[in-house]
From Swiss-Prot:
The keyword Zinc applies. This is Adenylate kinase. Residues 124-161 are annotated as: LID. Catalyzes the reversible transfer of the terminal phosphate group between ATP and AMP. Plays an important role in cellular energy homeostasis and in adenine nucleotide metabolism. Belongs to the adenylate kinase family. The keyword Zinc-finger does not apply. GO terms for cellular component: cytoplasm. Zn(2+) binds at residues 128, 131, 148, 151. Its EC number is 2.7.4.3.
Length: 212
């Protein structure tokens, strides 16, 4: 079985993916990791990918999906697709690639969270720069305010998590992903999970397991 996760930053996709990997034997496909490997191996696609990145340009869909296709040749089962596809064009290319391999996306899980909740979740995040553990000023407070429980390091907020930048990220995500939700919602296996302020990660995970 292959699963795709759709949801805005702060929707809990990462937490859900971790639980599915740990408890259900899935593997997560990271486009970023795949690109870095192709670049390090200096493959033709990797060289082309590096050229676009070095020029500060977006990597075209044909390059990104070419790298994904190479990975799928030997890995096309028990996968979690998160962060790919990002566009409708990528979704169609991915579907074609999987058909060639006699594989498919079995379930598309869309975690739908109101924008005001996302804003509060993300802008309230604090990170330990040493151990990378994440905290939250409301829902996951450290024992000592502003200090990591593990190593006593002062917690920081990532620049991208500032409220004004979060709003920009959420707007960009909405514009980018709305067509994907529309594309998949009429296909078999689409799961729509509404996550409100009171929904826990365990409740989302339980609902997903019940639908798989």
């Amino acid at each position: 079985m292959n699963i795709m996760l759709l949801g805005a930053p702060g929707s809990g996709k990462g937490t859900l993916a971790e639980k599915l990997i740990k408890n259900q034997g899935f593997n997560q496909m990271s486009t970023g990791d795949l690109m870095r490997k192709e670049i390090n191996d200096e493959t033709p696609l990797g060289i082309e990918c590096a050229r676009y990145m070095n020029e500060g340009r977006l990597v075209p869909d044909e390059v990104t999906m070419g790298i994904v296709k190479n990975f799928l040749q030997d890995n096309h089962n028990q996968l979690i697709f998160d962060g790919i596809p990002r566009t409708l064009n990528q979704a169609k290319i991915l579907e074609e690639n999987l058909i060639e391999l006699n594989a498919k996306i079995d379930k598309v899980i869309y975690i739908d969270v109101p924008s005001e909740i996302l804003l509060n979740r993300i802008s309230g995040r604090l990170i330990c720069p040493k151990c990378k553990v994440s905290y939250h000023i409301i829902s996951r407070k450290p024992k000592l305010e502003g200090i990591c429980d593990n190593d006593g390091t002062e917690l920081v907020r990532r620049p991208d998590d500032a409220p004004e930048k979060v709003k920009v990220r959420l707007e960009a995500y909405a514009n980018e992903t709305a067509p994907l939700v529309d594309y998949y919602k009429n296909k078999p296996g689409f799961i729509h999970i509404v996550d409100n302020a009171n929904t826990t990660a365990e409740e989302v995970y339980a609902e997903v397991l019940g639908a798989l």
